[in-house]
Amino acid sequence: MPFVHVELIEGRTEEQLTNMVKDITEAVSKNAGAPKENIHVIVNELKKDRYAQGGEWKK
């Protein structure tokens, strides 16, 4: 039962997220031999003002 965690900066459309989840599920199923119904994809969207790189807030 594979679990895939994805963290992204917010801003993608529902359609983009849906397509991404479908593509990830397909890739894991193909390469890990797992049935699609057993693959879990968890998407966490980070607020743009809650992301830092190199010690500096990204805005």
Curated annotation (Swiss-Prot):
InterPro entries tied to this protein: 4-OT (IPR018191), 4-OT-like_dom (IPR004370), Tautomerase/MIF_sf (IPR014347)
UniProt entry keywords in alphabetical sequence: Isomerase
EC number: 5.3.2.-
Active-site annotation: 2
Molecular function, one GO term: isomerase activity
A Pfam family assignment: Tautomerase
Gene3D superfamilies in alphabetical order: Macrophage Migration Inhibitory Factor (3.30.429.10)
Recorded family membership: Belongs to the 4-oxalocrotonate tautomerase family.
Protein name (Swiss-Prot/TrEMBL): Probable tautomerase EF_2859
Source organism: Enterococcus faecalis (strain ATCC 700802 / V583)
